[in-house]
């Protein structure tokens, strides 16, 4: 079993964006009957390499080409959205996908993105809590009082109770937010005490703790599978390094997030012991999956051209099938 992640980075020297978007949709359609458990789409704005800014739109295209594949949007920076408009898009996407799209909401962390939308970053926590309080009722079609006006979103979503919502973050504030609102919690860090804080906040507000996920020490977050690992690093290395450098630039001075690498060369990235970027042999991929873990594939990482990406994806899927055999 494996997951697919798409950030849609397209640096100038990589594949054309239109080809990458088409390939992402094709890959999801192809992979859903071959062991794909989940497609993960991220959201960032104003990035020099075109990082995906509209995950709900891409999710809609993927949902239209698939029938069973779950799609997680992680993380959506909720203070950058208008809650009424977001609820409308979530409701329609829930209808299109028949409930297969889930959301991990965060408060955002790049000052440039708040400036991009003219939003005050210093109020992001308060704004997020205000929006989370009304978003659920809105997608369920209830009348909501929001900032002095009565609002009702139509059509209501198809999923009873609304789409699955998680809170993404790695801080005590994120754990409290998830518990207060009764949502699941996806932590990007392994900060001690977060799990206990989340569970206590849930129960203090009348909720049973929901889905919870923490990073596993030494586990990769981006994987390719290749028969010839040396050749694969030669081909894929510049793309993986670009992804690593860009992701690290989003979090200057913050090394607490499991997916962040500070490598400044392909050699350094490859040499990281237990680092987030790995290229497995098929046998290593089989062993990883048989250890009870999902293989986190990132087929178009750093703008890998589709004709280059497909053979690596097929190799990974073949290994996943063998692991299940």
List where the protein language model places each region.
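Short, small-residue-enriched loops and turns at beta-alpha junctions
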Residues: 12, 46-50, 78-81, 252, ...
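N-terminal beta1-alpha1-beta2 module of alpha/beta enzyme domains
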Residues: 1-66, 70
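Hydrophobic faces of well-ordered beta-strands that scaffold small-molecule active sites
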Residues: 2-6, 39-41, 71-74, 101-105, ...
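Internal, glycine-rich beta/alpha segment that forms the wall or movable "lid"
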Residues: 82-181, 186-201, 205-213
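Short, acidic/polar
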Residues: 18-30, 89, 169-176, 281-289
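Active-site mouth loops of central-metabolism enzymes
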Residues: 8-21, 76-84, 161-169, 223, ...
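Generic C-terminus detector
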Residues: 296-324
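An alpha-helical appendage that flanks or caps ligand/catalytic pockets
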Residues: 4, 33, 122-155, 194-294, ...
């Amino acid at each position: 079993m494996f997951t697919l992640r798409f950030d849609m980075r397209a640096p100038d020297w990589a594949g054309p964006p239109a080809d990458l978007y088409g390939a992402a949709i094709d890959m999801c359609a192809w992979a859903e009957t071959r062991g794909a458990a989940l497609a993960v789409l991220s959201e960032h704005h104003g990035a020099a390499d075109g990082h995906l800014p509209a995950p709900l739109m891409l999710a809609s295209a993927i949902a239209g080409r698939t029938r069973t594949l779950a799609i997680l949007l992680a993380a959506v920076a909720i203070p950058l959205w208008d809650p009424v408009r977001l609820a409308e898009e979530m409701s329609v996407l829930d209808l299109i996908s028949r409930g297969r799209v889930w959301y991990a909401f965060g408060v955002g962390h790049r000052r440039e993105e708040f400036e991009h939308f003219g939003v005050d970053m210093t109020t992001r926590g308060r704004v997020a809590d205000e929006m989370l309080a009304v978003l659920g009722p809105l997608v369920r079609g209830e009348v909501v009082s929001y900032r002095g006006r009565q609002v009702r979103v139509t059509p209501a979503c198809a999923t009873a109770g609304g789409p699955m919502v998680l809170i993404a973050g790695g801080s005590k504030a994120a754990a409290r937010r998830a518990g207060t609102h009764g949502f699941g919690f996806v932590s990007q860090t392994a900060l001690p005490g977060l799990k206990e804080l989340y569970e206590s906040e849930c129960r203090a507000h009348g909720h049973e703790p929901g889905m919870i996920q923490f990073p596993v020490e030494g586990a990769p977050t981006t994987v390719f599978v290749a028969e010839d690992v040396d050749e694969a690093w030669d081909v894929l290395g510049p793309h993986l390094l670009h992804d690593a450098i860009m992701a690290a630039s989003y979090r200057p001075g913050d090394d607490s997030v499991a997916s962040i690498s500070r490598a400044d060369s392909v050699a350094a990235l490859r040499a990281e012991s237990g680092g987030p970027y790995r290229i497995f042999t098929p046998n290593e991929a089989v062993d990883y999956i048989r250890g009870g873990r999902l293989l986190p594939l990132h087929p178009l990482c750093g703008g890998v051209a589709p004709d280059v990406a497909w053979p690596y994806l097929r190799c990974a899927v073949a290994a996943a099938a063998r692991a299940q055999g």
